[in-house]
Amino acid sequence: MFNIKKRKESITGIPPINVNSPQSVPLSGTLQSPLITPNSPNFVSRQCPFKKFGCSSFLVSKAEFDNHLKDDAQFHLQLAVEKFDHQFDLHTQLMAHFTEQMEDQLEKTMKVVRNHTDSLGGNVQTKLDEGIEKCMAFAKKVEQQQQQLAKRLITQQIQEKKSTSSPLVKGGISGGGGSGGDDSFDGANISSMSTSKQELQQELQSLSIKMKKELTELSDELSQKLERSTGNIDIKIKRIEGEVNEKIDKRQLVSTIDDSIGKKTDSIGYTLESSIIKKVEEKEKKKSEQNQLLFDSKIESLKDKIKIIETQQLDTSSEVRKLKLESTSSGNLMAGLNGTSGRPSSSSHFIPSSVSAAANNINKNEIMEEVKKVEEKLQKKIREEIDNTKSELSKVERSVKDNRSEIEGLEKDCKNQFDKQDNKIKQVEDDLKKSDSLLLLMQNNLKKYNEFVDRERDRESERLKLQDSIKRLEQNQKKIEAEIQEGNEQVERVLREEASISPISSVPKSPITTKRSSIILNSPPMTSQQSSPKIQDLLSSSGSSSVSGINISSETGEMGILWEFDPIINKWIRLSMKLKVERKPFAEGALREAYHTVSLGVGTDENYPLGTTTKLFPPIEMISPISKNNEAMTQLKNGTKFVLKLYKKEAEQQASRELYFEDVKMQMVCRDWGNKFNQKKPPKKIEFLMSWVVELIDRSPSSNGQPILCSIEPLLVGEFKKNNSNYGAVLTNRSTPQAFSHFTYELSNKQMIVVDIQGVDDLYTDPQIHTPDGKGFGLGNLGKAGINKFITTHKCNAVCALLDLDVKLGGVLSGNNKKQLQQGTMVMPDILPELMPSDNTIKVGAKQLPKAEFSKKDLKCVSTIQSFRERVNSIAFFDNQKLLCAGYGDGTYRVFDVNDNWKCLYTVNGHRKSIESIACNSNYIFTSSPDNTIKVHIIRSGNTKCIETLVGHTGEVNCVVANEKYLFSCSYDKTIKVWDLSTFKEIKSFEGVHTKYIKTLALSGRYLFSGGNDQIIYVWDTETLSMLFNMQGHEDWVLSLHCTASYLFSTSKDNVIKIWDLSNFSCIDTLKGHWNSVSSCVVKDRYLYSGSEDNSIKVWDLDTLECVYTIPKSHSLGVKCLMVFNNQIISAAFDGSIKVWEWQSK
């Protein structure tokens, strides 16, 4: 056996494989890998260690393992970096989410705190006012007591004076009778007076002391009470500040600093600065003085030493001179002794020459040595002293340097301290400024609160007055009704008697005599008042008399002056008129009442001169001298009915004479604009009714002494409708009235606009004109505010386009039209025919279907797709709903097989950051990410591949949708980009429409819908690549859009779902039920399914628009998106799970 193995080894060169050994690798009909070398027989096949980061390679041999680690090191590093970026992005998103929640909580807490501070401020003010009032009352009481005490003291003094003066008088009388008088009694009186004065003074002092004590005690009590109240208030404020500090940043502290604290801080800052400066200056002075003294002392000591050295040098020089002199004198003596002068001396001794020479030499050497020694000593001393002086000078220099360094250090310390103090002072100043601003805000809030309270009080008083007036009016109405009933009975009796006597009516016949006579007979007749002599003369004539050629009926009525405005000549035409007014008004408003009236003829004003009737308005230059060309002659013939509008007695004071004429003039100007509008040949012509002012001269004048005024106009028969209001609100769906308002604004060069259009069909009355300056045209002229209201709410229609107004059908291209788009002034397109067809034919809110029953069925989770512990941001179907694609927060997307129990087929690393949106068409899968890119993927022969990366956005790409021709993407850069799928290039970018981040897109047939943080939904045409319309209504970010049939469903961060009718772009209803942001919604049959961040899924019945079913905890975290699959609902959530829901019987 051993030999056989050796033979195999010798032949093959490969050792045999031990089948029983655990380290052997079985060969299942295949050859062994050539990469397995004999050097690594124990290597076990494994996956790459960077599998956690996304590397999917499987390694068989050690060499392959080493080569893979070397070659793919950069790839592995890139994967690790992407994983880190992804985790960082998750962290930042979570932080952003938490910061948003914290901001919301802060706003709520700030509102609570503001309300609390407002209530506290009001309570504090009331308490302070009460305390001040009590103090004032107490002070008044004290003053009254003082006055009473003073009066009592004065009365006591007067009484005492009287009592003391009576004995004096008696003493004087008795003294006068005697001889001489007695002065002792006067002295006693004077002493008693002085004592009484002293006693009074003492009593006054004691009273003043008591009063002072009482005042001090009262003031102390008041101060203590005020301190307690202020202490309680301070404690409450501190508590509130503590609560706010726990919830709010230090930047947003709501604390009020008093002026005294500011003054104290300022004084403390200044005293600190002054004290520090003084101390530093004193230290510097002391140190400089000490250094100068030391330096001066050292210099003086050096000078003394130098003087000593100089004296020593002088002494040595003098000694040397002496020695030299001695040596010279000794030499001279020796020379005299040795010389031969020839003068012998008897007393001289004989000295040999050798002895003298030796003596001379000894003396010279000794002297020289001594001199040298002295010089050496001097030099040594000089050197030592020089060294000492140098060392001392160096020490002095060192000390000077040390002092300089110390001074510099002190200066630096002082500067640092000054800087710190400056910073502290600046902080205190900033705090004071903040406190001042907060105090101002508090004061403003208190003022507003006080104003609000005053207004409420005024309103309450007005309400009480109105209630009283209403009660009085009701009483008067009851009385008037009783009187009217009595008058009607009397009139009926008289009419019956007249009918029995003479069957012919006194009213002259006209083309509509039967109708008019029946109405007049059925209606209660008016009582004729006293008329002027001229009218009585006219009425006394037979049958029908004439006034300047115009026939006026002889029937009982009242006369009036008729005023008609001609807008062409801009003047008033003055006429006379006879009319008959019913007693009861047939309609009434807030200020005016309307009466049915019959015309009895119109004539000239020759019998009524201007001086007797008109006083102030209109002026003479505004009155036309010609009165023939007028409308009253034709429209107010004898027997015609019209409406008379008269102000109520309560509103007479508010209505001036000019107001009547302004109203009529305004209607005539609008009538002229109606004629201009009709000249443009609109689909329907319009007309404003004629209107006149009438002075009822037969009636008693008003309280201001002027005749009673009223306005009249023809009677409208039919349903009265209001098309738009004075504030620009559109009240009906009719196009002609709105187009007329737009027409007047454009053709007047934006100098006026006609609104408040109302009437029967296209016969209008009571309009209102707004002008930029707000002048003229009555009290309803709102100026620029009224014009802006119309501009922001008006939606142009086909009539606007037919009249070639300032709009363009099919989109807007110019800058002015872009502004109109943003403001809402654009053409309302008809998009229903080219929306995506739908099998759902339900009418939203129709309430035509039977009530849905959920007692026998539940929406249950029938399957949960494998979770990968990453949030699911988007899901989409691919390949005719055979595959489900899901985009995850780690930058990958996974493909699941629908028919194989939702098995995960592919996991693809798509982006460095999370995949926010995924979309599919028949050929491609599109993914978008916060890395500002869009990637295009294909699935072929069991493999996935990224074929293109679209780069163009400068912000996070939030959403993508696609059809077979174009891809649409929206981003945080506030743009929507259009990509051509044949070339994968950008062909269009919509900019400047959305003003904030764009969050979502929805595609239906030809049209694209977009929404975002600016709370507006825009409609786009994908063929003309232009914007058509916008819809406003949400109060927060628009998060998702879903289009079904002719309806658009939008969800928002404001926790609601809005349903829009795309036929007129109006909001049908708002569904409220979720308590957090609604992230997605879909429609299946008659039900709307909505998912929210409150973890719930709700079911809404579109027939009744009610929530009929709720799954409160559908996921552990918020629901991100919903989709419909056959009869099932698929939901994806932030917890990483994907669930399939289905209705099942219980």
Curated annotation (Swiss-Prot):
CDD domains: Alpha_kinase_MHCK_like (cd16968), WD40 (cd00200). The keyword Mitochondrion does not apply. Pfam families: Alpha_kinase, WD40. It catalyses: L-threonyl-[myosin heavy-chain] + ATP = O-phospho-L-threonyl-[myosin heavy-chain] + ADP + H(+). It comes from the Eukaryota. Its cofactor is Mg(2+); Mn(2+). The keyword Phosphoprotein applies. Keywords: ATP-binding, Coiled coil, Kinase, Nucleotide-binding, Phosphoprotein, Repeat, Serine/threonine-protein kinase, Transferase, WD repeat. Residues 1-25, 158-191, 521-540 are annotated as: Disordered. Residues 100-120, 187-241, 297-502 form a coiled coil. Residues 564-808 form the Alpha-type protein kinase domain. Its EC number is 2.7.11.7. Residues 172-181 have a biased composition (Gly residues). It is an enzyme of class 2 (transferase). Residues 521-534 have a biased composition (Polar residues). Residues 500-551 are annotated as: Pseudosubstrate/autoinhibitory domain. One of its GO terms (cellular component) is actomyosin contractile ring. Oligomer. This is Myosin heavy chain kinase A.
